[in-house]
Amino acid sequence: MALGPRYGAIRACGRVLERAFSLRKAHSIKDMENTLQLVRNIIPPLSSTKHKGQDGRIGVVGGCQEYTGAPYFAAISALKVGADLSHVFCASAAAPVIKAYSPELIVHPVLDSRSAVHEAEKWLPRLHALVVGPGLGRDDALLRNVQGILEASKARDIPVVIDADGLWLVAQQPALIQGYRKAVLTPNHMEFSRLYDAVLRGPMDSNDSHGSVLRLSQALGNVTVVQKGERDILSNGQQVLVCSQEGSSRRCGGQGDLLSGSLGVLVHWALLAGPEKTNGSSPLLVAAFGACSLTRQCNHQAFQKHGRSTTTSDMIAEVGAAFSKLFET
């Protein structure tokens, strides 16, 4: 299938760089290491002179009566990666459950209230990034409130990572994040297909995953897109990266929440570090590559210990060791 004149022109101008990273291919190890070094460059050093909150205050928007695990996984992953504070803005019915999971999270039971947008807005000046969608569900009232929170976040230039039912909302209203280059979308295969059809008004080419991710990003105004799968394909509409860091064959529910939570922290660090630390590469792409690599490494390590019984909680327990192995050695 032809990629179309626009894609061809972009390739001809040399603005599209495709790199495939695989630990199984010797020639790719150097590229893999080079990109991981860019991730290392954005990680702020620990210092006794810093104050609480300086290394990241992350907000997770999601959590309803049915889904309480996802926002917990995202928020606790942000802390495990290195954020100092992690907030959860959830429906009132979800709040006691999420609080019971961990005393380390700051939980706001406001998402289903009429004043949800106002209540969340009061906290936005204190937050460095938002993760929108884990455990959100598709209740119309919740989605309307999340739409308002997203608009308020954009107005304040706050980076947003959108996953799960946050992507459902974007598929219904693509204009919500059109052209907002501090947004990162993290769809799985089905979520990506839905988004692609909604934005480009047609099915994606299953034989051209790289081109499909590139085109969706371009159509959204160069919003960064991470298509999760056997290999994670990342694009900001100009560059395409493929992460094949070794994981495992175990696909447990919740590991996407680990990815989105860790990505929220890494996006903040990357934007704070700036392009000079990423050698001119997109800071958001570097952050996304780091989050994908970390999630896969956690999956690999957990699977080595637990095999078929591996769960996301097992993966989160591996964050510290996986982070050290990838980024501190």
UniProtKB/Swiss-Prot annotation:
Glycans are attached at residues 207, 222, 279. Pfam families: Carb_kinase. Keywords: ATP-binding, Glycoprotein, Lyase, Mitochondrion, NAD, NADP, Nucleotide-binding, Phosphoprotein. GO terms for molecular function: ATP binding; ATP-dependent NAD(P)H-hydrate dehydratase activity. Gene3D superfamilies: 3.40.1190.20. It catalyses: (6S)-NADHX + ATP = ADP + phosphate + NADH + H(+); (6S)-NADPHX + ATP = ADP + phosphate + NADPH + H(+). It is found in: Mitochondrion. CDD domains: YXKO-related (cd01171). The modification Phosphotyrosine is found at residue 67. GO terms for cellular component: mitochondrion. The keyword Lyase applies. InterPro entries: CARKD, Ribokinase-like. GO terms for biological process: metabolite repair; nicotinamide nucleotide metabolic process. The keyword Lyase applies. This protein may be expected to contain an N-terminal transit peptide but none has been predicted. This is ATP-dependent (S)-NAD(P)H-hydrate dehydratase.
